[in-house]
């Protein structure tokens, strides 16, 4: 059995039935100012990651989206879970629109990258 098939078999052996299987994702991004410096994590006299987190959570209060501030200062979006990948794609598009509109207003940029803190 190929490595791909063994991995697939292992993953699916721990999964639930097709009728109840759902999919979700987590997306992390770092936020930078116009000088390519990361924005502060804590509240201060400039727009911070903490300010962004509060605004994102307010904007998503009527959904199952979850936002958090990660140890490296990046913002993480955890999607709701969906049965259809198209619904997940729609949720991702809404998340991107929400965060991008805030960043544009504040003159900030994002870098989407997953990191390992160790």
Feature map (PLM): residue ranges:
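Terminal catalytic/cofactor-binding subdomain
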Residues: 1-118
């Amino acid at each position: 059995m190929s490595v791909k098939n063994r991995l697939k078999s292992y993953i699916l052996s721990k999964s639930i039935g097709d009728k109840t299987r759902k999919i979700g994702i987590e997306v992390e991004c770092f936020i930078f100012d116009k000088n390519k410096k990361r924005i502060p994590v804590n509240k201060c006299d400039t727009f911070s990651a903490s300010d962004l987190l509060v605004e994102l959570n307010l904007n998503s209060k009527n959904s199952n989206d979850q936002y958090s501030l990660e140890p490296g200062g990046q913002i993480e979006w955890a999607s709701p879970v969906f049965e259809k990948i198209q619904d997940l794609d729609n949720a991702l598009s809404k998340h991107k629109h929400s965060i991008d509109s805030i960043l544009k207003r504040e003159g900030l940029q994002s870098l989407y990258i997953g990191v390992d803190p160790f």
